[in-house]
Design a protein with these regions (language model features):
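N-terminal pre-P-loop "Q-motif" helix
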Residues: 1-14, 80, 803
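Helix-coil-helix junctions within alpha-helical repeat/solenoid scaffolds
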Residues: 19, 397, 405-409, 503, ...
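Short secondary-structure boundary elements
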Residues: 29-31, 47, 158-166, 170-363, ...
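Start-of-helix signal in alpha-solenoid helical-repeat scaffolds, especially tetratricopeptide repeats
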Residues: 305, 309, 323-330, 342, ...
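Internal alpha-solenoid helical repeat scaffolds
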Residues: 77, 102, 140-141, 171-173, ...
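Alpha-helical sensor/transducer elements of the RecA-like P-loop NTPase core
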Residues: 107, 114-175, 182, 189-192, ...
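Extended alpha-helical scaffolding segments used for macromolecular assembly and cargo binding
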Residues: 22, 36-40, 261-263, 283-286, ...
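Conserved phosphate-binding/catalytic loops and adjacent sensor/switch elements of nucleotide-binding enzymes
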Residues: 26, 31, 35-94, 103, ...
Length: 860
């Protein structure tokens, strides 16, 4: 039961207080009136009697109370009510619950009103909104005898809670949006939607997250409930609903033309449709989306084809003003009794892919291929397929064409999609390079060649050839009137290269060039250049700018746009982790990985898993971090070599979470060296700063040099942090913590504050020690309960050397001396020597007592 605390308390107070003698709950069918009313009466306790109004009992005087009153033959209403009242009150104080009080007969309603007026019983009743109600029932709340409580549908958060309680697991945010919109927050509808989707197999659990893929299913029980309302509608209104089923929303003029103005007005008056303004035009929508599913079930195949044909004929005579208009027309043509030309399906496929609705784009592209479309249709089909994980079919579709038979425009289009599929979906960098080289050798037109040069930049950056990526991108950006796809490929390849090089300002300029042409680019591809922009902003320390950029592409609501939704979650999770908002980051990234479970999105799962590993490590969840790193490593290769230094940083954080500080520092330093060799100076700075946060004092000089190369204030603060750490400068570390917090890098701030506390302790300054420790604790809490090496050391100051502390932590984690020696690459005798000295300093007699002390337990 999803609690409605405010309403529940209002009912309980009314049933026990000195004011009204109860409450009446009003609301639409299925919003949870009865459930809440019964829960409230059960909580109050005592003698509770429930009755329910029905259509069949409405014609029987005192029909709902008949089973309580017993057999009575009097025909005088006054005598009849007196006997009923006596029977109801015979057992003392009573709470009378009346479900569907709007269906009470007049005598029952009058009896209920008299009991309320006389305060002879406590009453709780439910009434459906929008229906005729007996006057006596209305008087219950109008005259103040009962408290009226209007029960609204569930909010989206309440709807998610309800569905998750039914499923026993986490619900995907994208699915939550779809279900909430389909149900309108109606608890009854939600329950049936979940049951119907489970039965149909469209609601399934992936990586622990429940996802809805495809149309929302309707159970037979819910269909029957809704059909009762549908069957009561006159024929003209039904015609309106039937047309709307296949074309929602539809222009009001078109609907009036097809169904008649009077029918449309009647449908609106009955509350089954609504007329709303959309882009300065009036359109017709269902008042409740599930009506469309019920109407769809009632129609046969022939009727549905005929209705689609009527709609297609009407809309094809009107101008196409948007991609949505074209997509709607193509959808109607697909399964209608009318025919449409190849050009419509190709254009609609491009529109759908541009809007990131890949399943729909695939349908249109297949229709174009079936109508003997050439390489253009095949290219559209492959673009839709590769992102959905059908990489083999995409390759087979494109490989069936002989490049020698294609003109240069076709070659560029065919080659770009095939290279994309081979590199990012299939992970075959060698084959991708071969195809790209083949196509480039056959193209001579400068503008077409620019597209392939831009593509070469994108390939180079993924293969960690940073300088090549930048050079190719610069060539495109300096080409006058370069085609949109050329500019976009260059904005991604060059933009990511610049971000990694630490040239954040130039990367943002590249990103803007990409934004200028993004209307020409496939919907999901836009995330590639946006990801580069988000990284550039976080590397420079512009966290608010990164947040704005990451949330710019969040308006995805169609069922087929789940991959775009997942990509947007990666962007948001990336910013969350950079800011230290780890619980939010973990939720966003885990949901993204579940949504992007298809092989077509494999390239984007790599960086997502790295961010996830960092988040888990920061919270001390080493097992989860190790799992994320293993998942990333499985998908590694030359096609994702650009992320190798960041993978090593994630491994360093994992080692830190496991308490092995020496290996953690070594891994971080190796990551810095690898990044330096690749000219990834922003990543080099990140790796060096990671080592400093683990306690490495030797990185100040390198970070100072990088501060002169890398844009933004973040690296400046990192450099000052490293200098203060090496000098055991407590005030300097406090200042670094303040600067990190101002920037929005909360975990860096927490680590700097924790190291400041240790420095103040070393200097014997207890006041500042306490202040810095309090700051570190506050920031760690803001990060979701962070547990880093610096924070752990500040929270538990011990008279141990760094190596002794490291080995003691591993003992506390349950490792044997041999396992510790293997992990730290030292001898067992060395481990034993450090343990011996640690036990003496901690005044314990053996390793078990030392382990207990480190875990905060009482030594045995």
């Amino acid at each position: 039961m999803i609690e409605r605390a405010t309403e529940f308390e209002a009912i309980r107070s009314a049933l026990t207080g000195d004011g009204p003698v109860g409450a009446v709950l009003t609301g639409d069918a299925g919003v949870g009136k009865t459930t809440l009313a019964r829960q409230a009466t059960a909580a109050v306790g005592g003698n509770v009697r429930w009755v329910a109004g029905t259509e069949s009992a409405r014609s029987i005087p005192l029909g709902v109370f008949a089973h309580m009153v017993g057999v009575y033959t009097a025909h005088d209403p006054v005598t009849f009510m007196s006997a009923a009242r006596e029977a109801l009150l015979a057992d003392g104080p009573i709470i009378i619950g009346v479900d569907d009080a709007h269906l009470l007969d007049q005598l029952s309603a009058t009896l209920l009103l008299q009991l309320a007026i006389d305060r002879a019983a406590r009453i709780v009743a439910t009434v459906r909104s929008g229906v005729q109600v007996p006057d006596a029932v209305t008087s219950l709340w109008k005259d103040g005898h009962l408290l009226r409580i209007d029960l609204n549908p569930f909010s989206q958060r309440q709807s998610v809670d309800l569905v998750e309680s039914m499923l026993g697991g986490q619900l995907e945010g994208f699915t939550a949006n779809l279900m909430w919109e389909s149900s309108g927050g109606n608890a009854l509808f939600l329950r049936h939607l979940v049951e119907g989707a489970l039965e149909a197999g469209s609601l399934r659990q992936v990586n622990g997250v429940w996802q809805l893929r495809g149309r929302a299913a309707v159970t037979s029980e819910l269909a029957a409930l809704l059909e009762d309302r549908v069957e009561q509608l006159p024929e003209p209104v039904l015609r309106v609903l039937e047309l709307l089923t296949f074309c929602e929303p539809i222009d009001l003029e078109v609907m009036a033309e097809l169904a008649g103005e009077e029918a449309v007005e009647a449908a609106e008056n009955r509350g089954v449709i609504r007329v709303v303004e959309n882009s300065h035009e009036l359109v017709v929508r269902y008042n409740h989306p599930l009506f469309g599913e019920v109407i769809r079930r009632r129609l046969g195949i022939a009727s549905a084809r005929r209705l689609r044909g009527r709609l297609y004929s009407a809309l094809s005579e009107r101008p196409i003003n948007s991609a949505a208009d074209r997509i709607r027309l193509a959808e109607l043509a697909l399964d209608s009794d009318k025919s449409a030309d190849l050009e419509l399906f190709e254009a609609a496929a491009a529109d759908a892919i541009g809007l990131a609705n890949l399943p729909l784009g695939e349908r249109f592209a297949r229709a174009a291929v079936e109508r003997r479309g050439g390489v253009e249709s095949a290219d559209l089909l492959a673009r839709a397929l590769l992102w959905q994980g059908h990489r083999i079919e995409a390759e087979r579709t494109l490989a069936s064409f002989d490049p020698d038979q294609l003109n240069e425009v076709q070659l560029a289009r065919w080659g770009s999609t095939r290279v994309s599929n081979l590199l990012w979906a299939m992970g075959d960098a060698d084959r991708a390079d071969e195809v790209l080289a083949l196509v480039r050798s056959k193209v001579s037109h400068p503008k077409i060649a620019a597209i392939l040069t831009g593509l070469a930049s994108a390939c180079a950056v993924n293969e960690n050839r940073i300088d090549d990526a930048f050079d190719d991108a610069e060539s495109v950006m300096n080409t006058e009137d370069a085609p949109p796809w050329a500019v976009w490929w260059a904005s991604f390849g060059g933009g990511l290269a610049l971000a990694l090089m630490g040239r954040g300002e130039a990367a943002r300029q590249y990103a803007q060039r990409g934004h200028d042409v993004e209307s020409h680019i496939d919907g999901l591809n836009r995330f590639m250049s946006t990801h580069a922009e988000v990284l550039a902003l976080t590397f420079t320390g512009d966290m608010e700018g990164a947040r704005r950029c990451a949330t710019a592409y969040f308006g995805y609501s169609a069922p087929g746009q789940y991959l775009a939704w997942g990509m947007s979650k990666i962007l948001q999770g990336t910013v969350d982790v950079a800011q230290g908002r780890f619980p939010d980051g973990i939720e966003h990234l885990e949901q993204a990985l579940a949504a992007l479970s298809t092989e077509g999105a494999a390239a984007w799962m790599f960086p997502a898993r790295l961010r996830l590993a960092e988040a888990y490590s920061a919270l001390g969840r080493a097992g989860d971090a190790a799992e994320a790193i293993a998942g990333a490593t499985e998908r590694g290769g030359r096609h994702s070599a650009v992320y190798e230094p960041q993978l090593e940083i994630a491994k360093a954080w994992l080692a830190g979470a496991e308490g092995t500080i020496t290996p953690a520092i070594r891994i971080a330093m190796n990551a810095a060296d690898a990044a330096a060799r690749a000219h990834q100076h922003a990543i080099e700075a990140m790796a060096l700063h990671t080592a400093a946060r683990f306690g490495e004092h030797s990185v100040a000089g390198r970070l100072a040099d990088l501060a002169a190369k890398v844009d933004g204030e973040l690296v400046q603060v990192q450099a000052r942090h490293a200098v203060a750490l090496a000098a055991h400068d407590g005030p300097g570390l406090d200042a670094a913590a303040t600067e990190f917090e101002r920037i929005g890098a909360l975990l860096s701030a927490a680590d700097a504050a924790a190291q400041a506390a240790s420095a103040h302790e070393r200097a014997g300054d207890r006041r500042r020690l306490l202040e810095s420790a309090a700051t570190a604790n506050r920031l760690a809490a803001a990060c979701g309960g962070a547990s880093t090496p610096a924070l752990r050391q500040a929270a538990q100051p011990l008279p141990l050397t760094a190596r002794e502390r490291e080995i003691a932590n591993l003992v506390a984690a349950g490792l044997t001396n041999r396992q510790i020696a293997d992990r730290l690459t030292v001898s067992v005798r060395t481990v034993e020597g450090h343990l011996y000295r640690a036990c003496i300093k901690m005044d314990v007699t053996d390793r078990e007592s030392l382990a207990a002390l480190l875990r905060g337990e009482t030594p045995p």
